[in-house]
């Protein structure tokens, strides 16, 4: 039987112009085998039918709570607003264009409780309009050295003990973290000695169309350098780990038309390294 007596899980979802995929994403949460959950939906000032769809979802399932931002606040601030409304002792994530496997929350919760980890994530399969084109996993055990290289947790799969998330006051709302809210959070937690673990199962499907790689520009890459540098200092990382600050500079120089090929090669190498 699903471990529903472990406690209420609040699933946070911030949506901006997510009308085409929102219902499917929400349904993948509300049909979980783990039944003791609620879905907190934030419409981050969308200009499409997102709010109307949210109203329909809430009318059909009392476990869905919905609200609107008057202006577009961005992911970090919107998730903090979701957290303020959440009732659960555990906090999970979900993105509006992704799909959770039906047992994702149950299996991740079981792993979280059995491992004693402060938070947990799982592996993902990556799809676009042509179908699944990649799978990704990170090692179960994570160190500060690994975090210095990259964010080793897939943000929309993360499940936190609420106290862990609140110990660092949730997500940063700084403009510098607008594309790196998750990495910033992981680094701030690691600076406090709090590092999660990865369940070695693929339980989540991430939608990544080719245009997803165009969201980062030179400015966001420079912001990423600042976030990384601040995180390295906070974690007390050795000087040798600062070499990884070069990565955002390199990515900023890659022609946009080549980005997907570069990312695919990166994920292939990452998958090979993970299996070692």
Task: Outline where the language-model segments fall.
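Acidic helix N-cap motif at the loop->helix transition within catalytic regions
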Residues: 21-23, 48-56, 99, 103
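Short, acidic, metal-binding catalytic loop of nucleotide-sugar glycosyltransferases
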Residues: 27-36
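A conserved acidic beta->alpha catalytic loop
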Residues: 43-52, 71, 95
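Acidic donor-diphosphate engagement hotspot in glycosyltransferases and nucleotidyltransferases
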Residues: 50, 78-79, 100-105, 130-131
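Glycine-rich, basic loop-to-helix element that forms the pyrophosphate-binding segment
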Residues: 69-86, 107
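Short aromatic/hydrophobic "clamp" motif used to bind/position activated sugar donors
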Residues: 91
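Conserved donor NDP-sugar-binding/catalytic core segment of glycosyltransferases
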Residues: 103-134
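Conserved nucleotide-sugar donor-binding catalytic segment
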Residues: 142-219
């Amino acid at each position: 039987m699903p471990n529903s007596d472990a406690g209420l899980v609040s699933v946070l979802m911030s949506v901006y112009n997510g009308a085409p995929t929102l219902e499917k994403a929400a349904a993948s949460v509300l049909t979980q085998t783990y039944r003791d959950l609620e879905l907190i939906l934030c419409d981050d000032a969308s200009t499409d039918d997102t709010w109307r769809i949210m109203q329909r979802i809430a009318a059909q399932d009392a476990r869905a709570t919905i609200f609107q931002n008057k202006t577009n606040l961005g992911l970090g601030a919107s998730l903090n607003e979701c957290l303020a409304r959440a009732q659960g002792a555990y906090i999970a994530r979900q993105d509006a264009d992704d799909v959770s496997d039906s047992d994702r929350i149950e299996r991740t919760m079981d792993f979280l409780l059995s491992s004693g980890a402060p938070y947990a994530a799982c592996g993902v399969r990556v799809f676009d309009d042509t179908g699944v084109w990649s799978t990704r996993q990170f090692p179960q055990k994570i160190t500060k050295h690994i975090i210095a290289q990259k964010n080793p947790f897939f943000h929309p799969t993360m499940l936190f003990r609420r106290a862990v998330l609140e110990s660092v006051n949730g997500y940063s709302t700084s403009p510098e973290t607008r594309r790196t809210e998750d990495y910033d959070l992981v680094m701030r937690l690691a600076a406090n000695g709090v590092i999660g673990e990865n369940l070695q199962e693929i339980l989540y499907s991430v939608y990544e169309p080719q245009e997803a790689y165009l969201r980062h520009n030179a400015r966001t890459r420079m912001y990423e350098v600042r976030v990384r540098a601040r995180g390295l200092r906070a974690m007390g990382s050795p000087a040798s780990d600062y070499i990884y600050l070069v990565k955002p500079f390199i990515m900023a120089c890659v022609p946009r038309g080549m980005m997907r090929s570069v990312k695919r090669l990166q994920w292939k190498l990452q998958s090979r390294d993970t299996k070692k």
